[in-house]
């Protein structure tokens, strides 16, 4: 019994250390060799939830325009999250300047409203960060 408790405590400690290491390694902003700026909202959007949990994204911008929004790993229900991809929610900001993308009113995808809102809010936070309109780092 004592061994089982120690084993569980050891595994729990390892998981906590791994989780904290992962979150520390997240780079919020990086610039690729071709000049593309990639904003990762894992940290700045850590309190933005979809239906089940946080919904971080990476926003790629080149020349001040959104090139791509990509959903990062999350715990949203796969079938509902697929509705977002099929509904092209992630493409809603492509081709827009960061300023225009931030101003754009994007509708949630029917059937995946909470997940949509999480993505939309993460994109907004990421764009604010890119434009220097936030104190979060």
PLM regions and their residue ranges:
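Flexible, solvent-exposed loop/hinge segments and secondary-structure transition points
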Residues: 2-10, 17-137
């Amino acid at each position: 019994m004592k061994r089982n408790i120690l084993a569980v405590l050891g595994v729990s400690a390892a998981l906590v250390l791994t989780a904290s290491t992962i979150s520390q390694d997240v780079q919020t902003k990086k610039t690729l060799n071709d000049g593309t700026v990639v904003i990762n909202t894992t940290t700045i959007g850590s309190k933005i939830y979809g239906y089940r949990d946080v919904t971080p994204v990476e926003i790629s911008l080149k020349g001040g325009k959104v090139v791509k929004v990509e959903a990062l790993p999350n715990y949203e229900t796969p079938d509902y999250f697929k509705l977002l991809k099929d509904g092209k929610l992630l493409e809603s900001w492509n081709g827009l300047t960061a300023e225009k993308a931030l101003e754009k009113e994007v509708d949630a995808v029917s059937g995946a409203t909470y997940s949509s809102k999480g993505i939309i809010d993460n994109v907004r936070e990421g764009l604010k960060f890119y434009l220097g309109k936030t104190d979060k780092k």
